[in-house]
């Protein structure tokens, strides 16, 4: 039972593989990012080993460590070994232990057999250890030597060793450096450059299960977003630039680009991060509210327009009331309440709250209470 994660982590990671196959890598990476964040959200999880020999209750094993963190660890293994060795190793593990029980050591032996690599270092810290790296990344440029030094400091108590990707952006081009971080407090890596790099970006694909603190200017976040090819760097750039929107031109440029991003989760995140008065973004928001192919994005865009309290959007809100999407319907009703409160009662009374989703109900409740729509209030 202590090795429960050997089963449950694959259940978690199978979802990643399905999302990757069915919906594409961006969607799979988004779900993985959210899954790992959910695991980290409970501070108790940091102190739990993945393989636990001491637990108070069998049911305690069904948690964000056995599932979410375990799935993230498998993803690291896949990327360290490569697809061919990883999946061949899994095949060997299944055949070798067919009709029997499985333990983490047996998984390690199969992966070592196929890959030819010693994986004790990996399993000792990730399967039989707790926590994850908490890093502080800083860089300094030496103009005389034409070198940049990247300092990676581990601030957690138990130190890890791991491979780490570092992107160096120079003259608009990314050079990816692959380094090995040893299990000590500080590691320095020196790279030859022609000038002070525009950006240093550690763990650009979010492959390493970690928390990384790295100060970046709005301009650097804009460069990170516009040069990144993966979801993680784009998504986190949007998140980190949020507080500078409408205050810094590079943050504004980043959000203007994100509202047009090909991946809908990035468009949605940008909409959610807009300030209360999004004047310079309204043209793009209107297009999303009218034409976006994803109802979640369309609904969020309508929600942004509702906050402007501009009556010119009333036809758009009234059209949205008839949408199938709960997001579009709920935000449209909120918009009507803002610009034409005399109409909101009539529209709200026609919505069937019994069959409505929880999200729609939560959106509508403030409108119902504020406007005293008695027909939708419980007796």
Report residues per predicted region.
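Hydrophobic alpha-helical and helix-loop surface patches within well-folded domains
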Residues: 1-152
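Solenoid-repeat scaffolds in large eukaryotic assemblies
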Residues: 86, 344-345, 377
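Structural detector for internal amphipathic alpha-helices that build alpha-solenoid repeat scaffolds
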Residues: 208-210, 232-246, 257, 265-278, ...
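Non-catalytic accessory/interaction domains
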Residues: 84, 97-283, 293-294, 298, ...
């Amino acid at each position: 039972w202590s090795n429960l994660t050997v089963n449950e982590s694959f259940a978690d990671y199978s979802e990643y593989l399905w999302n990757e196959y069915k919906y594409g890598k961006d969607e799979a990476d988004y779900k993985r990012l959210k899954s790992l964040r959910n695991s980290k959200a409970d501070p108790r999880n940091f102190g739990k080993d993945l393989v636990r020999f001491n637990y108070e209750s069998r049911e305690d094993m069904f948690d964000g460590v056995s599932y979410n963190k375990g799935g993230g660890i498998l993803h690291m293994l896949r990327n360290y070994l490569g697809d061919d060795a990883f999946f061949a190793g899994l095949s060997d593990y299944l055949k070798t232990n067919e009709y029997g029980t499985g333990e983490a050591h047996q998984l390690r032996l199969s992966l070592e057999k196929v890959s030819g690599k010693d994986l004790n270092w990996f399993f000792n810290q990730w399967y039989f250890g707790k926590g994850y790296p908490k890093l502080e990344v800083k860089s300094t440029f030496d103009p005389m030597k034409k070198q940049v030094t990247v300092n990676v400091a581990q601030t957690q108590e138990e130190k890890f060793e791991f491979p780490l990707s570092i992107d160096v952006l120079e003259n608009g081009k990314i050079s990816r450096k692959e380094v090995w971080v040893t299990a000590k407090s500080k590691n320095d890596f020196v790279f030859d450059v022609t000038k002070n790099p525009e950006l240093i970006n550690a763990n650009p694909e979010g492959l390493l299960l970690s928390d990384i603190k790295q100060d970046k200017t709005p301009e650097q976040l804009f460069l990170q977003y516009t040069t990144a090819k993966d979801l993680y760097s784009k998504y986190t750039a949007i998140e980190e630039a949020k507080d500078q929107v409408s205050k810094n031109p590079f943050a504004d440029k980043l959000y203007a680009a994100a509202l047009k991003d090909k991946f809908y989760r990035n468009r949605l995140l940008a909409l959610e991060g807009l300030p209360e008065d999004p004047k310079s973004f309204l043209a793009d928001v209107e297009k999303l509210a009218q034409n976006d192919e994803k109802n979640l994005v369309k609904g969020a865009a309508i929600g942004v327009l509702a906050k402007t309290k501009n009556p010119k959007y009333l036809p758009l809100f009234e059209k949205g009331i008839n949408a199938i999407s709960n997001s579009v319907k709920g935000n449209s009703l909120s918009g009507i309440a803002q610009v034409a409160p005399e109409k909101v009662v009539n529209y709200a009374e026609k919505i069937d709250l019994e069959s409505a989703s929880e999200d729609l109900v939560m959106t509508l409740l403030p409108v119902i209470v504020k406007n005293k729509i008695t027909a939708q209030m419980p007796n």
